């Protein structure tokens, strides 16, 4: 803002006097003249507050409005409704601070939030131990690998290609530093290839990584796949979408040793892909190998309930070689948003939203499968996301508006991560996409398919004429 300065001339003189220096030049006399700028910074003239808002509005107008057309993007980040209570609580000064709450003297309110978050995540995953959160889903995958290798003393990691590509990439990066061997198992009809998975697990396998629902939206048989790992002494690690756990069996009941995931669907907006938070839950025997921080409930000398940082095996607190992580901020504010959202939903609401997603996804899937030029990539069961193959129009043309109809569909192109599905895309549903929005998407796909068929017919006719 024009003319604003944090220190007046009198302030500067007082500060110089306090350190026994009589001028700014004297303060910087040890800096060689040749490296000093010697002139004011070449900054544009300042703007008033109203002018700044006008400038920001001008820049924002160049963007596409994501709310102008129904969006069906998913692939790990979902446009869920964030209730007003989330912003109302997270914006309170007791929580919205510039300092990360990992010091031992953190407030009782901050510690209770961590404890409530851990309790909620343990409940929905069916595992007894949760930490206070991690950066995001993929880094939680790396932490799971580290824990599994430490517990088993093995260095082999096996990951299904149904796992999110970002998590697999992160595992591959960390495997280099861990000295681990990472192998991937392919998919068959949208599900992890069970025979290939069983064959890939060896005596040196520390952990098997699965995802449910997987990246294509398919619901995996975690109990069956996990048996292959458990039979050979490997840990079963499952990535989960928290919003599906109201209708799916929790991973802890399916034999998982560790469950982790991306917490963005809970109380966090898309925000250009972040920030978000990750969650990490495990069986109790792995408590002391858990990454990050764990808050506990206790009693003081007067018998009053209190909260403490029970465990924080970070490299800032203990010897580096014994640390389980070096996490700092831990995205505590984002995790707070997540537990507020869960509390707002309640147990009945959590189940209700899962059932709603399943109904709407089933409706969308059946409608799209009936459109000429599009077919389902697989027939495995799904909850809130599914894969579609376009046989009429290139996927990028659908997304860019270059399909002769001008439609620019907000769907995720599978070819980015799966070359074998170059003609495929993901359709994701949230509670913000109702039947009207699904019909809008289907109408756009029908127009695109019709335009593609017409263009192909015209090209064929032109080719026939030239041959004739």
Feature locations, PLM:
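Hydrophobic alpha-helical scaffolding
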Residues: 2-5, 17, 42-46, 104-107, ...
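Conserved C-terminal alpha-helix-loop-beta "cap" of PLP-dependent enzymes
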Residues: 348-441
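Compact, charge-rich alpha-helical regulatory domains located at protein termini
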Residues: 1-38
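Short loop-beta-helix segment that forms the pyridoxal 5′-phosphate
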Residues: 102-106, 122-142
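N-terminal entrance/gating region of PLP-dependent enzymes' catalytic architecture
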Residues: 33-116
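PLP-dependent enzyme catalytic core of the Aspartate aminotransferase-like
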Residues: 2, 11, 17, 119, ...
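Active-site C-terminal subdomain of aminotransferase-like
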Residues: 266-372, 376-379
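Conserved PLP-enzyme active-site core in the AAT-like
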Residues: 15, 139-304, 373, 396-401, ...
């Amino acid at each position: 803002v024009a003319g604003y300065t944090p220190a007046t001339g009198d302030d500067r003189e007082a500060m110089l006097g306090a350190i026994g220096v009589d001028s700014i030049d004297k303060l910087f006399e040890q800096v060689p003249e040749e490296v000093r700028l010697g002139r004011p910074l070449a900054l544009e003239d300042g703007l008033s507050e109203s002018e700044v808002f006008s400038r920001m509005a001008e820049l924002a107008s160049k963007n596409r409005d994501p709310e102008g057309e129904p969006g069906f993007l998913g692939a790990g980040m979902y446009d869920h409704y964030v209730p007003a209570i989330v912003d109302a609580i997270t914006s309170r000064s007791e929580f919205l601070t510039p300092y990360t709450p990992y010091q031992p003297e953190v407030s009782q309110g901050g510690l209770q939030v961590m404890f409530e978050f851990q309790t909620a995540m343990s409940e929905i995953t069916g595992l007894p131990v949760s930490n206070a959160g991690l950066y995001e889903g993929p880094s939680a995958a790396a932490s799971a690998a580290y824990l599994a290798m430490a517990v088993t003393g093995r260095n082999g990691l096996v990951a299904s290609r149904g796992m999110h590509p970002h998590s697999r990439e992160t595992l591959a990066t960390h495997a280099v530093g861990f000295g681990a061997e990472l192998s991937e198992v392919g998919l068959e009809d949208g599900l992890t290839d069970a025979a290939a998975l069983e064959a890939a697990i060896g005596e040196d396998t520390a952990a098997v990584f699965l995802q449910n629902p997987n990246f294509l939206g398919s619901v995996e048989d975690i109990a069956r796949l996990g048996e292959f790992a458990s039979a050979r002494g490997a840990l079963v690690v499952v990535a989960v979408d928290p919003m599906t756990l109201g209708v799916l069996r929790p991973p802890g009941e399916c034999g998982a040793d560790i469950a982790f995931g991306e917490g963005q669907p809970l109380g966090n907006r898309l925000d250009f892909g972040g920030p978000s938070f990750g969650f990490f839950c495990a069986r109790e025997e792995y408590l002391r190998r858990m990454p990050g921080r764990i808050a506990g409930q206790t009693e003081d000398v007067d018998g009053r309930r209190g909260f403490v940082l029970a465990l924080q095996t970070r490299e800032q607190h203990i010897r580096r070689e014994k640390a389980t992580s070096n996490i700092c901020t831990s995205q505590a504010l984002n995790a707070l948003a997540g537990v507020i959202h869960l509390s707002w939903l309640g147990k009945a609401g959590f189940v209700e939203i899962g059932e709603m997603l399943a109904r709407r996804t089933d409706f969308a899937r059946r409608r799209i499968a009936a459109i000429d030029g599009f077919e389902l990539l697989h027939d495995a069961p799904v909850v809130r996301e599914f894969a579609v193959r376009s046989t009429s129009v290139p996927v990028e043309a659908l997304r860019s508006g270059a399909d002769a109809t001008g439609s620019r569909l907000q769907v995720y192109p599978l070819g980015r991560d799966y070359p074998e599905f170059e003609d495929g895309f993901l359709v994701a549903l949230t509670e913000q996409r109702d039947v009207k929005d699904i019909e809008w998407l289907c109408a756009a796909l029908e127009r695109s398919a019709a335009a593609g068929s017409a263009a192909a017919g015209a090209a064929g006719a032109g080719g026939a004429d030239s041959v004739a």
